[in-house]
Protein backbone atom coordinates (compact mmCIF):
# COMPACT_ATOMS: atom_id res chain seq x y z
CA UNK A 1 0.00 0.00 0.00
CA UNK A 2 0.86 3.67 0.12
CA UNK A 3 2.36 3.40 3.62
CA UNK A 4 4.71 0.62 2.57
CA UNK A 5 5.80 2.58 -0.52
CA UNK A 6 6.58 5.65 1.60
CA UNK A 7 8.70 3.55 3.98
CA UNK A 8 10.57 2.09 1.01
CA UNK A 9 11.19 5.61 -0.34
CA UNK A 10 12.78 6.62 2.99
CA UNK A 11 15.33 3.76 3.00
CA UNK A 12 17.77 5.34 0.52
CA UNK A 13 17.90 8.86 2.03
CA UNK A 14 18.10 7.39 5.56
CA UNK A 15 21.06 5.23 4.51
CA UNK A 16 22.82 8.27 3.00
CA UNK A 17 22.16 10.31 6.14
CA UNK A 18 23.49 7.56 8.40
CA UNK A 19 26.69 7.37 6.35
CA UNK A 20 27.07 11.17 6.42
CA UNK A 21 26.82 11.39 10.22
CA UNK A 22 29.19 8.47 10.82
CA UNK A 23 31.67 9.80 8.23
CA UNK A 24 31.66 13.18 10.02
CA UNK A 25 32.48 11.41 13.31
CA UNK A 26 35.33 9.50 11.65
CA UNK A 27 36.64 12.71 10.05
CA UNK A 28 36.52 14.44 13.46
CA UNK A 29 38.63 11.70 15.06
CA UNK A 30 41.06 11.79 12.12
CA UNK A 31 41.35 15.57 12.52
CA UNK A 32 42.08 15.13 16.24
CA UNK A 33 44.98 12.82 15.33
CA UNK A 34 46.32 15.06 12.55
CA UNK A 35 46.24 18.17 14.78
CA UNK A 36 47.54 16.26 17.86
CA UNK A 37 44.53 17.15 20.00
CA UNK A 38 45.59 15.47 23.24
CA UNK A 39 42.40 16.52 25.02
CA UNK A 40 40.99 13.41 23.30
CA UNK A 41 42.14 10.43 25.39
CA UNK A 42 42.33 8.17 22.34
CA UNK A 43 44.81 10.52 20.64
CA UNK A 44 46.88 11.01 23.82
CA UNK A 45 47.25 7.25 24.26
CA UNK A 46 48.11 6.42 20.63
CA UNK A 47 49.94 9.37 19.07
CA UNK A 48 52.48 12.13 19.70
CA UNK A 49 53.47 15.41 18.04
CA UNK A 50 56.63 14.15 16.29
CA UNK A 51 54.94 11.26 14.59
CA UNK A 52 55.00 11.14 10.74
CA UNK A 53 51.68 12.10 9.16
CA UNK A 54 51.13 8.60 7.72
CA UNK A 55 51.19 7.10 11.22
CA UNK A 56 49.07 9.90 12.67
CA UNK A 57 46.32 9.02 10.20
CA UNK A 58 46.83 5.25 10.53
CA UNK A 59 46.80 5.66 14.31
CA UNK A 60 43.08 6.44 14.04
CA UNK A 61 42.40 2.70 13.60
CA UNK A 62 45.48 1.45 15.48
CA UNK A 63 43.43 1.02 18.66
CA UNK A 64 40.19 -0.60 19.82
CA UNK A 65 37.90 2.45 19.78
CA UNK A 66 39.16 3.92 16.51
CA UNK A 67 39.08 0.58 14.70
CA UNK A 68 35.44 0.11 15.74
CA UNK A 69 34.62 3.54 14.33
CA UNK A 70 36.36 2.59 11.05
CA UNK A 71 34.33 -0.66 11.04
CA UNK A 72 31.03 1.23 11.38
CA UNK A 73 32.07 3.84 8.80
CA UNK A 74 32.69 1.08 6.25
CA UNK A 75 29.42 -0.61 7.24
CA UNK A 76 27.51 2.60 6.52
CA UNK A 77 29.55 3.13 3.34
CA UNK A 78 28.35 -0.18 1.90
CA UNK A 79 24.74 0.77 2.61
CA UNK A 80 25.28 4.12 0.91
CA UNK A 81 26.91 2.36 -2.06
CA UNK A 82 23.81 0.19 -2.49
CA UNK A 83 21.71 3.36 -2.43
CA UNK A 84 23.84 4.89 -5.19
CA UNK A 85 24.58 1.90 -7.41
CA UNK A 86 21.67 -0.45 -6.71
CA UNK A 87 19.14 1.28 -8.94
CA UNK A 88 18.48 -1.96 -10.84
CA UNK A 89 17.44 -3.76 -7.64
CA UNK A 90 13.75 -4.42 -6.91
CA UNK A 91 12.62 -1.60 -4.56
CA UNK A 92 11.31 -3.98 -1.88
CA UNK A 93 14.48 -6.06 -1.76
CA UNK A 94 16.69 -2.96 -1.76
CA UNK A 95 14.82 -1.18 1.03
CA UNK A 96 14.77 -4.30 3.23
CA UNK A 97 18.49 -4.91 2.67
CA UNK A 98 19.23 -1.29 3.62
CA UNK A 99 17.06 -1.65 6.73
CA UNK A 100 18.97 -4.75 7.84
CA UNK A 101 22.29 -2.99 7.15
CA UNK A 102 21.16 0.03 9.18
CA UNK A 103 20.11 -2.17 12.13
CA UNK A 104 23.53 -3.84 12.16
CA UNK A 105 25.11 -0.37 12.24
CA UNK A 106 22.84 0.72 15.11
CA UNK A 107 23.98 -2.31 17.12
CA UNK A 108 27.64 -1.38 16.66
CA UNK A 109 26.92 2.29 17.38
CA UNK A 110 25.29 1.36 20.69
CA UNK A 111 28.32 -0.78 21.55
CA UNK A 112 30.66 2.16 20.83
CA UNK A 113 28.56 4.66 22.78
CA UNK A 114 28.20 2.39 25.82
CA UNK A 115 31.65 0.76 26.02
CA UNK A 116 34.18 2.20 23.54
CA UNK A 117 33.78 5.96 23.11
CA UNK A 118 36.66 7.19 20.89
CA UNK A 119 36.01 10.81 21.93
CA UNK A 120 36.47 10.44 25.71
CA UNK A 121 38.15 13.60 27.02
CA UNK A 122 41.24 14.22 29.15
CA UNK A 123 41.19 17.24 31.45
CA UNK A 124 43.69 18.80 31.61
CA UNK A 125 45.20 17.53 28.34
CA UNK A 126 48.84 16.32 28.48
CA UNK A 127 51.55 18.28 26.65
CA UNK A 128 52.30 15.27 24.44
CA UNK A 129 50.94 11.82 23.76
CA UNK A 130 52.23 8.36 24.65
CA UNK A 131 52.79 7.35 21.03
CA UNK A 132 51.86 4.17 19.21
CA UNK A 133 53.04 0.65 19.94
CA UNK A 134 56.40 0.50 18.03
CA UNK A 135 55.39 -2.75 16.30
CA UNK A 136 52.43 -0.93 14.74
CA UNK A 137 54.56 1.90 13.33
CA UNK A 138 54.70 0.31 9.91
CA UNK A 139 53.14 1.06 6.49
CA UNK A 140 51.22 -2.20 6.97
CA UNK A 141 49.05 -0.44 9.57
CA UNK A 142 47.98 2.13 6.98
CA UNK A 143 46.76 -0.43 4.42
CA UNK A 144 46.13 -3.82 6.06
CA UNK A 145 43.23 -2.95 8.44
CA UNK A 146 41.20 -0.84 5.94
CA UNK A 147 41.37 -3.56 3.27
CA UNK A 148 40.61 -6.26 5.83
CA UNK A 149 37.61 -4.33 7.13
CA UNK A 150 36.33 -3.62 3.61
CA UNK A 151 36.34 -7.40 3.17
CA UNK A 152 34.90 -8.40 6.55
CA UNK A 153 32.24 -5.71 6.61
CA UNK A 154 31.49 -6.11 2.91
CA UNK A 155 30.09 -9.56 3.57
CA UNK A 156 27.47 -7.95 5.82
CA UNK A 157 25.89 -6.70 2.60
CA UNK A 158 25.47 -10.29 1.42
CA UNK A 159 23.88 -11.10 4.80
CA UNK A 160 21.52 -8.12 4.51
CA UNK A 161 20.47 -9.17 1.01
CA UNK A 162 19.91 -12.74 2.24
CA UNK A 163 17.63 -11.60 5.08
CA UNK A 164 15.80 -9.24 2.70
CA UNK A 165 15.27 -12.06 0.19
CA UNK A 166 13.94 -14.38 2.91
CA UNK A 167 11.51 -11.68 4.05
CA UNK A 168 10.38 -11.21 0.45
CA UNK A 169 10.20 -14.95 -0.16
CA UNK A 170 12.35 -14.74 -3.28
CA UNK A 171 15.62 -16.65 -2.76
CA UNK A 172 16.18 -17.54 -6.41
CA UNK A 173 18.65 -17.19 -9.29
CA UNK A 174 17.75 -13.50 -9.70
CA UNK A 175 18.62 -12.82 -6.04
CA UNK A 176 21.98 -14.56 -6.50
CA UNK A 177 22.68 -12.36 -9.52
CA UNK A 178 21.90 -9.16 -7.59
CA UNK A 179 24.07 -10.07 -4.59
CA UNK A 180 27.04 -11.40 -6.59
CA UNK A 181 28.80 -8.02 -7.28
CA UNK A 182 28.74 -7.06 -3.60
CA UNK A 183 30.02 -10.47 -2.51
CA UNK A 184 32.80 -10.40 -5.12
CA UNK A 185 33.86 -6.90 -4.04
CA UNK A 186 34.08 -8.02 -0.40
CA UNK A 187 36.03 -11.14 -1.43
CA UNK A 188 38.57 -9.07 -3.42
CA UNK A 189 39.07 -6.61 -0.54
CA UNK A 190 39.44 -9.44 1.99
CA UNK A 191 41.97 -11.22 -0.22
CA UNK A 192 44.03 -8.03 -0.53
CA UNK A 193 43.82 -7.48 3.23
CA UNK A 194 44.99 -11.03 4.01
CA UNK A 195 47.89 -10.76 1.53
CA UNK A 196 49.00 -7.42 3.03
CA UNK A 197 48.67 -8.82 6.56
CA UNK A 198 50.65 -11.95 5.70
CA UNK A 199 53.42 -9.85 4.15
CA UNK A 200 53.47 -7.55 7.19
CA UNK A 201 53.63 -10.48 9.64
CA UNK A 202 56.35 -12.18 7.56
CA UNK A 203 58.91 -9.39 7.86
CA UNK A 204 57.93 -8.40 11.42
CA UNK A 205 60.18 -10.84 13.27
CA UNK A 206 58.25 -10.80 16.54
CA UNK A 207 55.12 -12.22 14.92
CA UNK A 208 56.70 -15.48 13.87
CA UNK A 209 56.00 -15.72 10.14
CA UNK A 210 52.97 -15.83 7.91
CA UNK A 211 49.54 -15.26 9.46
CA UNK A 212 46.27 -16.31 7.83
Description of each model-found segment:
Residues 1-212:
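Polytopic transmembrane helical bundles with strong interfacial aromatic enrichment
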